Amino acid sequence: MDNARMNSFLEYPILSSGDSGTCSARAYPSDHRITTFQSCAVSANSCGGDDRFLVGRGVQIGSPHHHHHHHHRHPQPATYQTSGNLGVSYSHSSCGPSYGSQNFSAPYSPYALNQEADVSGGYPQCAPAVYSGNLSSPMVQHHHHHQGYAGGAVGSPQYIHHSYGQEHQSLALATYNNSLSPLHASHQEACRSPASETSSPAQTFDWMKVKRNPPKTGKVGEYGYLGQPNAVRTNFTTKQLTELEKEFHFNKYLTRARRVEIAASLQLNETQVKIWFQNRRMKQKKREKEGLLPISPATPPGNDEKAEESSEKSSSSPCVPSPGSSTSDTLTTSH
């Protein structure tokens, strides 16, 4: 194998069941998905030098390979994360023309190969042979074993995994799907962590503890809503408006007694009559300013509230004629 340009086709000797000396090399790349190899129906004893497994994708490894056989036992977990199917072609020199070359496209099947291998002794028995790749090791010198192969003519091959690196670096187990990138894998691992499972319930902040007053609703009185800021506007009937306009034509300001009397006759409350007269006076002033109506000399502008307050006080106080007013009345009557 060329050390300058190496497609990482790692050759593994095949130990046939009958003769341990006649071995042919099977080349496997170090970057392919987990593959189950099926043995062909030829005798393992007749395997020549042309009996090879050729596997598709290779990686560029710049450092030479040093082959060492270690005679001690060590755990070798092997699972990898790969993408795409692996194309395996198998050809045998002793097979006839009718046999030809077989191509295997193995699906993705993540197995964890965790075995303890003793190179000097027997080899562990396992199910369909699984070799997994996608070795993401740096460009350092790789010390590896030749993986042994033992079995019959049609038996399932067994493999002993390499240990890469000068200190026999153990490869991490990849338990995620092949479609996930490392970023997504780390995100899923963070989501599956026990800290997220035992997350605290919703926190209560200070602004959530503030008690807000509910909106005020107007209380329904005898004739409608009373004295509330969000009181509904009173809709007066035509008869009520006619009587109020008639009273406004004679008296711009009402005494409390007269206001109670008008409210009782029109089926309104005292507050409604008072507010109607206030609005009517403001409307009158607006029209006078616009020149639509002549200025009424009854009360000077600006003294409306004083006149209304004085009328209320006079209506509430007992009607006791003063001595001056009585003398003035007698004088006017004598004249």
UniProtKB/Swiss-Prot annotation:
<keyword id="KW-0805">Transcription regulation</keyword>
<feature type="short sequence motif" description="Antp-type hexapeptide">
    <location>
        <begin position="204"/>
        <end position="209"/>
    </location>
</feature>
<dbReference type="InterPro" id="IPR046327">
    <property type="entry name" value="HXA1/B1/D1"/>
</dbReference>
<dbReference type="GO" id="GO:0000978">
    <property type="term" value="F:RNA polymerase II cis-regulatory region sequence-specific DNA binding"/>
</dbReference>
<feature type="region of interest" description="Disordered">
    <location>
        <begin position="281"/>
        <end position="335"/>
    </location>
</feature>
<feature type="compositionally biased region" description="Low complexity">
    <location>
        <begin position="313"/>
        <end position="328"/>
    </location>
</feature>
<dbReference type="GO" id="GO:0050795">
    <property type="term" value="P:regulation of behavior"/>
</dbReference>
<keyword id="KW-0217">Developmental protein</keyword>
<dbReference type="GO" id="GO:0007634">
    <property type="term" value="P:optokinetic behavior"/>
</dbReference>
<dbReference type="InterPro" id="IPR020479">
    <property type="entry name" value="HD_metazoa"/>
</dbReference>
<dbReference type="GO" id="GO:0060876">
    <property type="term" value="P:semicircular canal formation"/>
</dbReference>
<comment type="similarity">
    <text>Belongs to the Antp homeobox family. Labial subfamily.</text>
</comment>
<dbReference type="Pfam" id="PF00046">
    <property type="entry name" value="Homeodomain"/>
</dbReference>
<keyword id="KW-0804">Transcription</keyword>
<dbReference type="GO" id="GO:0090102">
    <property type="term" value="P:cochlea development"/>
</dbReference>
<comment type="function">
    <text>Sequence-specific transcription factor. Regulates multiple developmental processes including brainstem, inner and outer ear, abducens nerve and cardiovascular development and morphogenesis as well as cognition and behavior. Also part of a developmental regulatory system that provides cells with specific positional identities on the anterior-posterior axis. Acts on the anterior body structures. Seems to act in the maintenance and/or generation of hindbrain segments. Activates transcription in the presence of PBX1A and PKNOX1.</text>
</comment>
<dbReference type="GO" id="GO:0005634">
    <property type="term" value="C:nucleus"/>
</dbReference>
<dbReference type="GO" id="GO:0060840">
    <property type="term" value="P:artery development"/>
</dbReference>
<feature type="DNA-binding region" description="Homeobox">
    <location>
        <begin position="229"/>
        <end position="288"/>
    </location>
</feature>
<dbReference type="GO" id="GO:0048839">
    <property type="term" value="P:inner ear development"/>
</dbReference>
<dbReference type="GO" id="GO:0050905">
    <property type="term" value="P:neuromuscular process"/>
</dbReference>
<keyword id="KW-1268">Autism spectrum disorder</keyword>
<comment type="subunit">
    <text>Interacts with OGT (via TPR repeats domain); the interaction takes place mainly in the nucleus. Forms a DNA-binding heterodimer with transcription factor PBX1.</text>
</comment>
<feature type="compositionally biased region" description="Basic and acidic residues">
    <location>
        <begin position="303"/>
        <end position="312"/>
    </location>
</feature>
<dbReference type="InterPro" id="IPR009057">
    <property type="entry name" value="Homeodomain-like_sf"/>
</dbReference>
<dbReference type="GO" id="GO:0021599">
    <property type="term" value="P:abducens nerve formation"/>
</dbReference>
<feature type="region of interest" description="Disordered">
    <location>
        <begin position="61"/>
        <end position="80"/>
    </location>
</feature>
<protein>
    <recommendedName>
        <fullName>Homeobox protein Hox-A1</fullName>
    </recommendedName>
</protein>
<dbReference type="GO" id="GO:0000785">
    <property type="term" value="C:chromatin"/>
</dbReference>
<dbReference type="GO" id="GO:0048702">
    <property type="term" value="P:embryonic neurocranium morphogenesis"/>
</dbReference>
<dbReference type="GO" id="GO:0001228">
    <property type="term" value="F:DNA-binding transcription activator activity, RNA polymerase II-specific"/>
</dbReference>
<dbReference type="GO" id="GO:0050890">
    <property type="term" value="P:cognition"/>
</dbReference>
<dbReference type="GO" id="GO:0045944">
    <property type="term" value="P:positive regulation of transcription by RNA polymerase II"/>
</dbReference>
<dbReference type="InterPro" id="IPR017970">
    <property type="entry name" value="Homeobox_CS"/>
</dbReference>
<dbReference type="GO" id="GO:0090103">
    <property type="term" value="P:cochlea morphogenesis"/>
</dbReference>
<keyword id="KW-0371">Homeobox</keyword>
<dbReference type="GO" id="GO:1990837">
    <property type="term" value="F:sequence-specific double-stranded DNA binding"/>
</dbReference>
<dbReference type="GO" id="GO:0043565">
    <property type="term" value="F:sequence-specific DNA binding"/>
</dbReference>
<dbReference type="GO" id="GO:0009653">
    <property type="term" value="P:anatomical structure morphogenesis"/>
</dbReference>
<dbReference type="GO" id="GO:0042802">
    <property type="term" value="F:identical protein binding"/>
</dbReference>
<keyword id="KW-0238">DNA-binding</keyword>
<dbReference type="GO" id="GO:0042473">
    <property type="term" value="P:outer ear morphogenesis"/>
</dbReference>
